[in-house]
Regions:
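PLP-dependent amino-acid enzyme catalytic core
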Residues: 1-495
Length: 495
């Protein structure tokens, strides 16, 4: 029997992987989780002889058991191709006393490409497998990176449309330019007056709107999600942690079975949850170090056992982590509750109603794999400058948060375990913040002048994703209030 998926909130209906990917969010508002976390059937030694596509297949076949070998391998081949600027797809580099897993070599230069390059292929295959005759409408909230990566993946894919909502004024200049210049007949980008949490909570509400679901069905449409709430986003991310470990083993940086700590800059909790899944599959991962910025709701949760979003929302230089409602944490809560959906549903209801919840002591004991800390704006900038000056390596703001938290972790624990840091975006995506951190003289430079200067000082070629927006025409300029999001979707679909 293959892996089946259930809601974290109690809906007892079982779904195959393809059905869960098509639906995105469970009908009761919960997230889909596998009935049991599968194990790898290959050793790390065996994986170390494989390329990225082969490792991805070995990991993903364990979760997506209703896809045939041919279907899954075709999806992988179509995703991880020459749209990535290195054959390694996700190379690991050794700098400043750690290993940086560079997840930004895809078409939109952020780690979201690792999953969103394959999600459209998984979804179109799922639609065929399930005889879905409706057009799939991808509805996505973005804190900056998901939106562009999702649009790049779904643009002009037959049988799909995509609507992306982003917080106007809450993303970097390059992130916004990437989105509003996106081509594709099936693509719509909308700024909202509000922050990412506003966008995400309204998108979730649209998913749960039964009246809207009926209206869409009558018009020949059905919703799905490209956010990390979709299990089809999460599963491909597990692969790169297995690949990184296997590469370090191949290169003699690790001995077989030696533990590797992993640091992940964290917002919506999907990327670090993928590392947790990799550890549970058998990848020898030690501590999972959760790095937050000034929006440190996760740091407080790991320290106190209480999750409380009732606080000021802070705009930082690491906007993809400017999040107070960390959606994927729900999958971990379900797990530490012993897969008890009633406990999880009660906590999520409390979060919805009161903006907070507290886990039991028994649940907290099951968080031993995790360590949480945060880096403020000054610490983040100082880390960018420090690593650049010591190693000539330029990192983006999110990676710098992780790097700074790693230094705090070592100072606090004395742990000398070798460590992998997830490098989640190209520094070119946040050139102003990166250059200002290196030298205050760059604070008032023009965006593309700073990009050119970053190229000069780093010796790293400007990515095609940045060059192509330099002179690209703005194609999307809609900005709406939160309450107008539903109407905006209906108008785009002609309903």
């Amino acid at each position: 029997m293959g892996v089946l998926y259930y809601s974290t909130r109690g809906d007892k209906q079982a779904y195959t992987a393809s059905q869960a990917i098509l639906q995105g969010l469970a009908k009761d508002g919960g997230l889909f989780v596998p009935d049991a976390l599968p194990k790898l059937d290959k050793t790390m030694e065996e994986l170390s002889a494989m390329d990225y596509k082969e490792v991805a297949y070995e990991v993903m076949k364990q979760f997506l058991t209703d896809y045939t070998e041919e279907e899954l391998k075709t999806c992988i081949k179509n995703a991880y191709n020459d749209r990535f600027d290195t054959p390694a797809i996700a190379p690991t580099v050794k700098k400043a006393g750690a290993y940086y897993l560079e997840l930004f070599h895809g078409p939109t230069i952020a780690f979201k490409d690792m999953a969103l390059s394959i999600l459209p292929h998984l979804m179109v295959t799922a639609a065929k497998k399930n005889n879905c005759d409706k057009e799939i409408v991808i509805l996505t909230a973005t804190s900056g990176d998901t939106g562009k990566a999702a649009m790049a993946g779904f643009a002009d894919v037959p049988g799909t449309r995509i609507v992306v909502f982003y917080p106007k004024g809450g993303v970097s200049a390059v992130q916004e330019k990437q989105m509003v210049t996106q081509k594709g007949k099936n693509v719509k980008v909308v700024g909202i007056h509000g922050n990412f949490d506003d966008a995400q909570s309204r998108v979730k509400a649209l998913f749960g709107d039964k009246e809207l679901e009926k209206e869409l069905a009558e018009g020949g449409f059905q919703f799905s999600s490209a956010n990390s709430i979709n299990i089809g986003r999460l599963v491909p991310q597990v692969a790169y942690y297995a690949y990184a470990y296997a590469n370090l083993l191949r290169d003699g940086e690790l001995k077989d079975g030696e533990l590797l700590n992993v640091v992940v800059p964290t917002g919506n909790f999907g990327n670090i949850l993928a590392a947790y899944y990799a550890k549970n599959m058998g990848v020898p991962i030690g501590k999972l170090i959760c790095a937050s910025n000034d929006n440190k709701v996760l740091f407080d949760f790991f320290r106190s056992g209480s999750y409380d979003r009732n606080r000021e929302f802070i705009l930082t230089t690491s906007p993809s982590m400017d999040i107070l409602i960390s959606s994927n944490l729900e999958r971990l809560i379900y797990r530490i509750a012993g897969d008890d959906s009633a406990v999880n549903a009660e906590l999520m209801a409390s979060l919805s109603k009161n903006g907070k919840y507290t886990i039991t002591e028994k649940m907290a004991e099951r968080l031993g794999d995790f360590y949480g800390n945060y880096a403020n704006e000054d610490e983040t900038a100082a880390q960018i400058k420090s690593v650049y000056e010591s190693d000539g390596y330029v990192m983006d703001t999110h990676t710098a948060v992780a790097s700074a938290v790693y230094e705090k972790y070592k100072a606090e624990t004395g742990d000398t375990t070798k460590t992998l840091i997830a490098s989640t975006a190209s520094p070119y995506k946040f050139a102003r913040s990166v250059m200002s951190a290196i030298d205050s003289k760059y604070e008032n430079g023009e965006d593309f002048a700073l990009i050119d200067e970053l190229c000069r000082i780093s010796g790293v070629k400007i990515p095609a994703a940045v060059e192509e927006i330099r002179s690209a025409a703005v194609l999307h300029n809609t900005v709406v209030d939160r309450d107008e999001m539903k109407q905006t979707v209906l108008e785009f679909l002609g309903l």
